[in-house]
Amino acid sequence: MRTLCIGDIHGNYKALVEVLERSKFDMKKDRLISLGDIYDGHSKGPECVDLLMKIKNFVWVLGNHDEYVRRWFTGDWKKFPDGEARWLRKGGSITRDAYHKNGKLNKKLVKKHAEFIKQAVLYFIDEKNRLYVHAGIDWKYAVDKQPSEKNYYTGRDTWRVDATKL
């Protein structure tokens, strides 16, 4: 099984399809790890998610834009007091509008995607002990003991690589 990573799709369905085609991605055999931000930016976020749902070995690492959409799906903005307004300013209005058809919210699609996004993880460690995360972590803490889950999708710490392990 090959493992391929993709990050920051931002609703660009055409680019997602092109990357999968050019890499000769096998939807049944290969693993795709999304490093987050499937949503916001382009208007085809729902189409991207529909395609990703067809991949047998798909890992969704949560990005900050995915977290915004997840909160929009649930209406839970407690941890983000200005979250919805901020999300709408940062590309969320495009995603929100993409879930509407003829001016009405497509509740069936929202429900389906809200269920699928529940599988998203804050980070992923594969069988070779490689860490996959959207943004970063605070290196003073263990990967699974971060002081805030926001570190995983908004952290800006510099990555460390141990070249002796490569």
Map each language-model feature to its residues:
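Core catalytic region of metal-dependent phosphoesterases/phosphodiesterases
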Residues: R2, I6, G11-R86
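Acidic, His/Gly-enriched loop-helix segments that form or flank divalent-metal centers
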Residues: R86-L166
